[in-house]
């Protein structure tokens, strides 16, 4: 996931970024360009984003659950 994020950050155009995820057949795209959110810096600027933070968040929750089971 880190390599994908790095490649996505290096992409300069939307087509280049979209191609990062097309190498895998039957899988979703790894990254995409989207506009920033309100309250963030430069909300109108398109930025290359990927979903790897969701994987990291899910992994952190799994580790937390596992550690809480060890407490019993």
Swiss-Prot record:
It is a lipid-anchor; GPI-anchor. It comes from Trypanosoma brucei brucei. A lipid is attached at residue 50 (GPI-anchor amidated aspartate). Residues 51-72 form a propeptide. It comes from the Eukaryota. Transmembrane segments: none annotated. This is Variant surface glycoprotein MITAT 1.1000BC. VSG forms a coat on the surface of the parasite. The trypanosome evades the immune response of the host by expressing a series of antigenically distinct VSGs from an estimated 1000 VSG genes. The lineage of its organism: Eukaryota, Discoba, Euglenozoa, Kinetoplastea, Metakinetoplastina. Pfam families: Trypan_glycop_C. It is found in: Cell membrane. Keywords: Cell membrane, Glycoprotein, GPI-anchor, Lipoprotein, Membrane, Trypanosomiasis. Signal peptide: none annotated. GO terms for cellular component: plasma membrane; side of membrane.
């Amino acid at each position: 996931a880190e390599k994908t994020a790095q490649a996505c950050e290096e992409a300069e155009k939307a087509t280049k970024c979209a191609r990062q995820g097309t190498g895998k057949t039957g899988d979703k795209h790894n990254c995409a360009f989207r506009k920033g959110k309100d309250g963030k810096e430069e909300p109108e600027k398109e930025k290359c984003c990927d979903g790897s933070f969701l994987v990291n968040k899910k992994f952190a929750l799994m580790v937390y659950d596992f550690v809480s089971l060890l407490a019993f």
